[in-house]
Amino acid sequence: MSNAVQPSVTSPPVAPGGERPGRLFFHSFTFERSPSGRGTAHIVLEFAGKQWSGRAEGQSSPIGDLRLGAEAAMHAVEDFAARSLGLELMGVKLIRAFDANVVIVSATQRAARDVKLVGCYLADEDAMRGAALAVLNATNRVLGNYLTTR
């Protein structure tokens, strides 16, 4: 038996409105394909009871749909940060790893001398939603810094 002290696990404090302070939350994601082959991705993010959305539209294809999901998330993050982060989506990949589908996104933050950002998400059920969530994972630290300095 070890004598090591086990750290206690606590939940972050919850503000009176039920919100956890200091985090941008994923609210919803939708993707629609038109009969003409166009795809539209829409994401809603939430912070302190307010919502920010991002939308991306383009030609629908398996790879193009992933990019639309990621671009919609990038637009929502930039909208939340009043376009001050200088984020740019570089690429999106869906790979099979460890018997699971994983979406990986690569982005840069031009406002910080081209800092490279990478995020991933296990996307077995919905790869387009996974691409949007991978963007949120990639930008998590940048958003945390933004929130502490605003």
Where are the model-predicted features located?
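Acidic (E/D-rich), amphipathic helical modules within compact regulatory domains
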Residues: 45, 49-79
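Short beta-strand elements
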Residues: 31-52, 101-113
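Mixed-charge, glycine-accented linear interaction segment located at domain edges/termini
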Residues: 53, 111-150
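Non-catalytic linker/capping segments at the edges of enzyme domains
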Residues: 1-41
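Short, solvent-exposed interaction modules
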Residues: 75-127
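Conserved P-loop NTPase/AAA+ ATPase motor core
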Residues: 26-41, 51-53, 81, 85-96
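Intrinsically disordered, low-complexity regions
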Residues: 1-11, 46-50, 147-150
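Conserved active-site and cofactor/substrate-binding residues in soluble primary-metabolism enzymes
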Residues: 36-38, 64, 68, 126, ...
